[in-house]
Amino acid sequence: MIKEFNTQTTLNVGLEALWAAQSKDITLVVPKVLPNIVKDVQVIEGDGGVGTKLIFNFLPGIAPVNYQREVITEYDELSHTIGLQVVEGGYLNQGLSYYKTTFQFSAISENKTLVNVKISYDHESELIEEKVKPTKTSESTLFYLGQLEKFLLNGA
């Protein structure tokens, strides 16, 4: 059964800049935002919308796995929502059978954005949930968003 974990953060960056970075510019931005973790991000198939397949290549020795393939399963420019589902590698190599992160961006003001994050996951064994806790994976996501904020504020 798929479980969900929700969290949110507020970033001091405008909605449009965040949306562009997390959607159409994701392959360029992620390696710059996480240069000590992500070697590169490549589009394997698609045009950036629903169904687009991405591969995130990690630097050797940093993560327990060296790559993660993801598919964009949600993409809505009106609600500024993007969902990325891991389909190979990454958390799936750590015992999860399903893992998806959905970001929804909402403007608070011209230079402030609320980011709602929903992590959906499933696993074969309760022992796996102890090993790959959603709170821990959400911390990684919030760390990424904080680094993204710094990157965009520094004139990216």
Swiss-Prot record:
UniProt binding sites for gibberellin A3: Q22, Q68, T141
A single GO molecular function term of this UniProt record: protein phosphatase inhibitor activity
Gene Ontology cellular component annotations, sorted alphabetically: cytoplasm; nucleus
Keyword Metal-binding attached: no
InterPro entries, A to Z: Bet_v_I/MLP (IPR000916), Plant_def-hormone_signal (IPR050279), START-like_dom_sf (IPR023393)
GO BP annotations listed: abscisic acid-activated signaling pathway; defense response; gibberellic acid mediated signaling pathway
SUPFAM superfamilies: Bet v1-like
UniProt keyword terms in alphabetical order: Gibberellin signaling pathway, Pathogenesis-related protein, Plant defense
Pfam families found in the cross-reference section: Bet_v_1
Family membership: Belongs to the BetVI family.
Functional note: Binds gibberellin A3 (GA3) in vitro.
Stated name of the protein: Phytohormone-binding protein
